[in-house]
Amino acid sequence: VSPVKAHIKEKIMNNGTFRPTLKILADKLIEDMISEARELLVKFGIEVENQEAMQLLGDAGAKIDKEKRRAYISQDLIDKCLKTVPSSIKVYNREGELALNLEGDNVYFNPGSGALTVYDYEKDEIRAALTEDYIKLTRLTDALPYIKAQSTCCVPSDVPSEIADRYRLYLSLLNCSKPIITGTFVVEGWEVMKDMLVAIRGSEKELKEKPLAIFDCCPSAPLKWSNLTCQSLIDCAPAGIPSEIIPMPLTGATSPVTLAGAIVQNLAENISGIVIGQLAQPGAPIIFGGSPSGFDMRKATPPMGAIETMMIDCAYAEVAKYLKVPTHAYMGLADAKLPDAQSGLESGIGAILAALAGINVISGPGMLAFENCLSLE
C-alpha cells in the first residue's frame, strides 16, 4: 500500500470520514514569505503606542526609537518567541467542559463579530443593533450544534459606548454556554471583563486552567500597535486567556496591492504580536489570525466575499501551520446586504475553503455587508 493510500485509510478508520486538505503555497514560497516578514520587523520595525510593550521589547534586546515610537525586532528575538508560543490551545464552555481544541486541522465556526447593524427579517431592513437583537443572536448561537463558539456578535446602540465591551460579555455569559470570542474597547474594560470570567470559573487559577474566552486584538495596518491592542495582549498573557491577533491589511490601501505583499504584512503583524505576548508571559496562548481583504478602489469597500480575500486568508493560515501556531480567519461571511443568493454563494464558498484549509477558528457566519451587519439567517 502506498504511503498516501495508507494515510487516507488511517484517517477514515480513525474519524469515519476523510477531508481533503487545501494547500495553495509551495514550501519554498512559505519560507520566502516568512523570511520577508521577519525582514520587515528587523529593518522597518513596528510602531508601538504602549509604554509597557516598548519596555518589554527594549529589555529583550529590540532596538527602540523613542522619537518615532518604533521597535525593531531582531531575528534572535523572533526565534526565541516562536519557540515558546503554544501549538495547541484548549478552550472550555461555561460548565468547564472542553469545547475547542485548537490544533492541527481541527475546525470550529463562530458568528462574525463587532457588527454595528442587524438585518431585521420581520421588517426587511437594516437598522442599528439593540440589546434585544444581541440576546436573540446569542441564544440562537447556543442552539446551533455546528456553531461551536459564540462571539460578541454586534454592538448594541442602546447602551453607552464607554461600557459596550463589558455589557456584551455580560449578555453572552448570561444567554449562552459556549466559549466566547470577545475583546476590549477601552483599556479600563479588561479588569471588569476578567472579573466576570473569574466569577464563572471560581478563581483566577481555574480560569487559567480552563479559559472560557478568547480576546481579539487588532493591530493597525501597516505595522502599528495601538495602546489598547498592546495592553490587551499584555493583560491576557499572564491570565492564560488566549489572544487572537487580527491584522486587517487592505490590498492597495493599507498594504501592498499584491496578494503576496498583503500576506507578508499579515505575517509580520502576527509575528510581532506573538513577540509582545511571549515577552509578557512565555508560553502565553496566541492564535494567528486575520481579517484581510482586497480593496475596491472605485467604491472604497473591502470585498470580504471576493476570492482574492479568501486566497489571502487560506495562505496566511498555511504559513501559520508551518510555524505550528493555532489559526483563525474571517471567512464564511458575505458582502450582500440581505440573505439572498449572493450571500449564500459567498458564505458557502468561504466556509468550505476555510474548512478545507483546516483553519481552527472560523469567524463569519451571519455576517453581511462588508462585516457591518449581522443576520439571524
Question: Where is each model-derived feature located?
Answer:
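Short beta-alpha connecting loops at secondary-structure transitions
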Residues: 18-22, 298-304, 332-339, 366-376
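Acidic, His- and aromatic-enriched active-site or binding-groove loops in soluble protein domains
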Residues: 170-182, 264-275, 312, 352
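Glycine-rich phosphate/pyrophosphate-binding loops
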Residues: 247, 280-290, 326-331, 357-370
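Phosphate/pyrophosphate-binding betaalpha-module
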Residues: 272-328
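C-terminal catalytic subdomain
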Residues: 337-377
